[in-house]
């Protein structure tokens, strides 16, 4: 069985984005057409379906590296921030975009929060989380997409036919 680990991201992510759009798992918010995706970007994304592509990339990262949190995802999707004459520094991606996408994926039942422990807060007990991991339904969707693009992958990358 082909899994998400066997397919390169350049083939897998567009196919997963299309499957998620058909599945109605995520939808682009109204404000998403006006925002940048990271502090190191100068303009909003040019693609009309960039929200689905980002959500697919987030789901792939959770499937491969989960449990993973919003901060680690923001660092992974960030880039190189141009500081002019000073040296470039790492720029992180928008946590609001990542958090909203994760909330939509949670509502669709594709990811879930991983509770770690309960600590005592000012207002009572507070649940702490280690990030999000993929659910069985999310794993089924991801593996189904990986299996559907297997032939295309084998034609582009001949060495992958052993998987």
List PLM regions with ranges.
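Long, low-complexity, charged/polar intrinsically disordered regions in eukaryotic proteins
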Residues: 1-56, 60
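Short amphipathic alpha-helical elements of helix-turn-helix/winged-helix folds
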Residues: 57-65, 76, 101
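Short acidic, hydrophobic short linear motifs in intrinsically disordered regions
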Residues: 67-89
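Basic amphipathic alpha-helical segments that dock to polyanions
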Residues: 73, 98-108
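Residue-level detection of the helix-turn-helix DNA-binding "recognition helix"
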Residues: 78, 103, 143, 147
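A short, conserved structural fragment
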Residues: 106-123
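Short, amphipathic alpha-helical interaction segments positioned at domain boundaries
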Residues: 122-163
């Amino acid at each position: 069985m082909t899994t998400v680990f066997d397919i390169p991201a350049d083939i897998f992510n567009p196919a997963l984005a299309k499957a998620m759009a058909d599945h109605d798992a995520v939808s682009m918010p109204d404000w998403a057409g006006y925002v940048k995706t990271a502090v190191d970007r100068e303009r909003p994304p040019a693609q009309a379906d960039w929200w689905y592509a980002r959500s697919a990339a987030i789901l792939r990262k959770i499937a491969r590296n989960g449990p993973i949190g919003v901060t680690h995802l923001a660092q992974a999707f960030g880039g190189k921030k141009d500081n002019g004459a000073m040296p470039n520094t790492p720029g992180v991606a928008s946590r609001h975009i990542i958090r909203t996408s994760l909330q939509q994926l949670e509502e669709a039942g594709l990811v879930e929060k991983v509770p770690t422990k309960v600590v005592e807060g000012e207002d009572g007990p507070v649940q702490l989380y280690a990030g999000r991991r993929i659910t069985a339904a999310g794993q089924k969707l991801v593996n189904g997409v990986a299996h559907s693009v297997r032939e295309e992958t084998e034609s582009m990358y001949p060495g992958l036919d052993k998987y």
